[in-house]
Protein backbone atom coordinates (compact mmCIF):
# COMPACT_ATOMS: atom_id res chain seq x y z
CA UNK A 1 0.00 0.00 0.00
CA UNK A 2 1.32 3.45 -0.96
CA UNK A 3 -0.79 6.37 0.22
CA UNK A 4 1.26 8.93 -1.73
CA UNK A 5 0.75 7.17 -5.06
CA UNK A 6 -2.74 5.96 -4.27
CA UNK A 7 -1.68 2.32 -4.71
CA UNK A 8 -3.35 -0.47 -2.75
CA UNK A 9 -2.41 -3.65 -4.60
CA UNK A 10 -1.87 -7.27 -3.67
CA UNK A 11 0.93 -9.27 -5.30
CA UNK A 12 0.01 -12.94 -5.19
CA UNK A 13 2.56 -15.64 -6.06
CA UNK A 14 -0.08 -18.34 -5.73
CA UNK A 15 -1.82 -18.01 -9.11
CA UNK A 16 -2.07 -21.10 -11.32
CA UNK A 17 -4.15 -22.62 -14.10
CA UNK A 18 -5.90 -25.69 -12.70
CA UNK A 19 -7.04 -26.56 -16.24
CA UNK A 20 -3.49 -26.88 -17.53
CA UNK A 21 -2.75 -30.34 -19.01
CA UNK A 22 -1.90 -32.95 -16.35
CA UNK A 23 -1.98 -30.36 -13.57
CA UNK A 24 -2.35 -32.80 -10.65
CA UNK A 25 0.25 -35.22 -12.04
CA UNK A 26 2.75 -32.41 -12.69
CA UNK A 27 2.06 -30.96 -9.24
CA UNK A 28 2.94 -34.32 -7.67
CA UNK A 29 6.17 -34.40 -9.68
CA UNK A 30 7.09 -30.84 -8.72
CA UNK A 31 6.76 -29.62 -12.30
CA UNK A 32 3.90 -27.17 -11.87
CA UNK A 33 4.19 -23.61 -13.16
CA UNK A 34 2.70 -20.90 -10.95
CA UNK A 35 2.73 -17.20 -11.63
CA UNK A 36 2.68 -13.85 -9.92
CA UNK A 37 -0.68 -12.09 -10.12
CA UNK A 38 -1.70 -8.58 -9.10
CA UNK A 39 -5.11 -7.38 -7.96
CA UNK A 40 -6.48 -4.45 -6.01
CA UNK A 41 -6.98 -4.91 -2.30
CA UNK A 42 -10.78 -4.59 -2.36
CA UNK A 43 -11.19 -7.53 -4.75
CA UNK A 44 -8.63 -9.56 -2.80
CA UNK A 45 -10.37 -8.96 0.54
CA UNK A 46 -13.80 -9.71 -0.93
CA UNK A 47 -12.58 -13.02 -2.37
CA UNK A 48 -10.98 -14.18 0.87
CA UNK A 49 -14.03 -13.14 2.86
CA UNK A 50 -16.24 -15.13 0.48
CA UNK A 51 -13.98 -18.16 0.90
CA UNK A 52 -14.09 -17.81 4.69
CA UNK A 53 -10.34 -17.21 4.98
CA UNK A 54 -8.98 -14.70 7.49
CA UNK A 55 -6.07 -12.50 6.43
CA UNK A 56 -3.30 -11.13 8.65
CA UNK A 57 -1.32 -8.07 7.57
CA UNK A 58 2.25 -7.36 8.65
CA UNK A 59 3.30 -3.76 8.04
CA UNK A 60 6.99 -3.85 7.18
CA UNK A 61 9.29 -1.32 8.83
CA UNK A 62 11.06 -0.26 5.63
CA UNK A 63 12.73 3.01 4.69
CA UNK A 64 11.41 4.95 1.70
CA UNK A 65 14.35 3.70 -0.35
CA UNK A 66 13.63 0.09 0.61
CA UNK A 67 9.94 0.50 -0.20
CA UNK A 68 10.79 1.86 -3.65
CA UNK A 69 13.22 -1.01 -4.24
CA UNK A 70 10.64 -3.60 -3.17
CA UNK A 71 8.01 -2.10 -5.47
CA UNK A 72 10.54 -2.10 -8.31
CA UNK A 73 11.45 -5.75 -7.68
CA UNK A 74 7.81 -6.83 -7.61
CA UNK A 75 7.00 -4.80 -10.72
CA UNK A 76 9.94 -6.33 -12.57
CA UNK A 77 8.87 -9.78 -11.40
CA UNK A 78 5.38 -9.12 -12.78
CA UNK A 79 6.60 -8.49 -16.31
CA UNK A 80 5.10 -11.13 -18.67
CA UNK A 81 8.47 -12.74 -19.28
CA UNK A 82 9.22 -13.00 -15.53
CA UNK A 83 5.93 -13.73 -13.77
CA UNK A 84 5.77 -17.51 -14.40
CA UNK A 85 7.96 -19.66 -12.15
CA UNK A 86 8.46 -23.36 -11.51
CA UNK A 87 6.56 -23.96 -8.28
CA UNK A 88 7.91 -26.27 -5.60
CA UNK A 89 5.61 -26.92 -2.65
CA UNK A 90 8.46 -26.98 -0.12
CA UNK A 91 11.29 -24.90 -1.56
CA UNK A 92 9.77 -22.25 -3.84
CA UNK A 93 6.13 -21.52 -3.14
CA UNK A 94 3.81 -18.55 -2.70
CA UNK A 95 5.22 -17.85 0.79
CA UNK A 96 8.95 -18.18 0.10
CA UNK A 97 8.88 -16.17 -3.15
CA UNK A 98 7.86 -12.85 -1.55
CA UNK A 99 10.34 -13.49 1.27
CA UNK A 100 13.17 -13.53 -1.28
CA UNK A 101 12.06 -10.16 -2.69
CA UNK A 102 11.85 -8.60 0.78
CA UNK A 103 15.34 -9.83 1.67
CA UNK A 104 16.67 -8.37 -1.58
CA UNK A 105 15.01 -5.00 -1.00
CA UNK A 106 16.46 -4.13 2.40
CA UNK A 107 19.65 -2.13 2.97
CA UNK A 108 21.75 -4.49 5.04
CA UNK A 109 20.78 -7.94 6.20
CA UNK A 110 17.70 -9.56 7.65
CA UNK A 111 18.56 -11.30 10.90
CA UNK A 112 16.13 -13.76 12.44
CA UNK A 113 15.85 -14.31 16.17
CA UNK A 114 16.56 -18.02 15.89
CA UNK A 115 19.24 -19.99 14.08
CA UNK A 116 17.43 -20.54 10.80
CA UNK A 117 19.80 -23.14 9.34
CA UNK A 118 20.28 -25.42 12.35
CA UNK A 119 18.27 -28.65 12.23
CA UNK A 120 16.84 -27.91 15.64
CA UNK A 121 13.12 -27.80 14.94
CA UNK A 122 12.65 -31.52 15.49
CA UNK A 123 9.98 -31.48 12.80
CA UNK A 124 9.76 -32.64 9.21
CA UNK A 125 7.87 -31.52 6.12
CA UNK A 126 5.37 -34.31 6.74
CA UNK A 127 4.86 -33.21 10.36
CA UNK A 128 3.96 -29.71 9.23
CA UNK A 129 1.63 -30.90 6.50
CA UNK A 130 -0.15 -33.19 8.93
CA UNK A 131 -0.46 -30.34 11.44
CA UNK A 132 -2.11 -28.00 8.96
CA UNK A 133 -4.23 -30.60 7.16
CA UNK A 134 -5.92 -31.86 10.31
CA UNK A 135 -9.57 -32.47 9.52
CA UNK A 136 -8.83 -32.78 5.79
CA UNK A 137 -8.06 -36.49 5.69
CA UNK A 138 -8.32 -36.95 1.93
CA UNK A 139 -5.98 -34.02 1.29
CA UNK A 140 -3.53 -35.45 3.82
CA UNK A 141 -3.82 -38.88 2.20
CA UNK A 142 -3.07 -37.43 -1.24
CA UNK A 143 -0.05 -35.50 0.03
CA UNK A 144 1.30 -38.57 1.81
CA UNK A 145 1.12 -40.47 -1.48
CA UNK A 146 3.09 -37.76 -3.27
CA UNK A 147 5.83 -37.29 -0.68
CA UNK A 148 8.91 -39.48 -0.55
CA UNK A 149 11.01 -40.57 2.41
CA UNK A 150 12.90 -37.24 2.49
CA UNK A 151 9.72 -35.62 3.76
CA UNK A 152 10.39 -37.35 7.11
CA UNK A 153 13.87 -35.87 7.59
CA UNK A 154 14.26 -33.03 10.13
CA UNK A 155 14.20 -29.57 8.56
CA UNK A 156 15.57 -26.24 9.72
CA UNK A 157 13.56 -23.14 10.51
CA UNK A 158 14.17 -21.49 7.16
CA UNK A 159 12.74 -24.49 5.33
CA UNK A 160 9.77 -24.47 7.72
CA UNK A 161 8.90 -21.02 6.38
CA UNK A 162 7.17 -22.65 3.41
CA UNK A 163 4.23 -22.64 5.84
CA UNK A 164 2.85 -19.06 5.99
CA UNK A 165 2.18 -19.27 9.75
CA UNK A 166 5.87 -19.99 10.38
CA UNK A 167 6.85 -17.16 8.03
CA UNK A 168 4.58 -14.86 10.03
CA UNK A 169 6.12 -15.94 13.34
CA UNK A 170 9.74 -15.58 12.23
CA UNK A 171 9.10 -12.24 10.51
CA UNK A 172 7.64 -10.89 13.75
CA UNK A 173 10.93 -11.68 15.52
CA UNK A 174 13.28 -10.58 12.71
CA UNK A 175 15.52 -7.50 12.71
CA UNK A 176 16.86 -5.46 9.82
CA UNK A 177 20.52 -4.66 10.47
CA UNK A 178 21.76 -1.88 8.19
CA UNK A 179 25.29 -1.30 6.93
CA UNK A 180 26.08 0.85 9.97
CA UNK A 181 25.07 -1.96 12.30
CA UNK A 182 21.86 -0.28 13.42
CA UNK A 183 18.97 -2.70 14.02
CA UNK A 184 15.24 -2.18 13.68
CA UNK A 185 12.29 -4.61 13.72
CA UNK A 186 11.26 -5.93 10.31
CA UNK A 187 7.57 -5.75 11.26
CA UNK A 188 6.21 -2.44 12.54
CA UNK A 189 2.76 -3.79 13.37
CA UNK A 190 0.48 -6.73 12.72
CA UNK A 191 -3.29 -6.82 12.41
CA UNK A 192 -6.05 -9.02 11.07
CA UNK A 193 -7.61 -7.21 8.11
CA UNK A 194 -10.10 -9.85 6.93
CA UNK A 195 -12.14 -11.39 9.74
CA UNK A 196 -14.65 -14.04 8.70
CA UNK A 197 -15.52 -15.60 12.04
CA UNK A 198 -14.70 -19.04 10.66
CA UNK A 199 -12.92 -21.61 12.83
CA UNK A 200 -10.86 -24.67 11.78
CA UNK A 201 -13.86 -26.84 12.62
CA UNK A 202 -15.82 -25.14 9.84
CA UNK A 203 -13.43 -26.57 7.27
CA UNK A 204 -13.32 -30.17 8.48
CA UNK A 205 -14.10 -32.52 5.61
CA UNK A 206 -17.14 -34.73 6.06
CA UNK A 207 -17.98 -38.17 4.74
CA UNK A 208 -16.01 -41.38 4.40
CA UNK A 209 -12.32 -41.26 5.31
CA UNK A 210 -9.37 -42.95 3.54
CA UNK A 211 -9.12 -45.48 6.37
CA UNK A 212 -12.81 -46.29 6.12
CA UNK A 213 -12.49 -46.70 2.37
CA UNK A 214 -9.57 -49.10 2.77
CA UNK A 215 -11.45 -51.10 5.41
CA UNK A 216 -14.50 -51.32 3.17
CA UNK A 217 -12.34 -52.50 0.28
CA UNK A 218 -10.80 -55.21 2.45
CA UNK A 219 -14.26 -56.39 3.51
CA UNK A 220 -15.45 -56.52 -0.09
CA UNK A 221 -12.36 -58.40 -1.24
CA UNK A 222 -12.60 -60.85 1.66
Model-derived regions, located:
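Glycine-rich catalytic cores of cysteine/serine-nucleophile enzymes that process amide/ester linkages
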Residues: 1-52
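Extracellular structured ligand-interaction cores
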Residues: 8, 57-59, 95, 140
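Short coil/turn segments at secondary-structure boundaries
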Residues: 54-62, 86-89
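Activation targets extended, charge/polar-rich intrinsically disordered C-terminal tails
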Residues: 76-222
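Solvent-exposed loop/turn segments at secondary-structure junctions
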Residues: 15-19, 67, 80, 93
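A structural motif
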Residues: 62-75
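Acidic/histidine-rich, surface-exposed loop or edge segments in extracytoplasmic proteins
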Residues: 47-56, 76-83
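Structured loops at beta-to-helix junctions and adjacent beta-edge loops in soluble globular domains
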Residues: 14, 63, 146-148
Amino acid sequence: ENYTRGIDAVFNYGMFNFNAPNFIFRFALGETDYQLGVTDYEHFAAEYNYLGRDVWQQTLNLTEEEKERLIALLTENYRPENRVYRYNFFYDNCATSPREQIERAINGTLQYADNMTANSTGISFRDLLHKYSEGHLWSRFGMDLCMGSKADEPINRRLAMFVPFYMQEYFNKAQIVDKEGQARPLVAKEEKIVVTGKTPADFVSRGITPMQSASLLLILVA
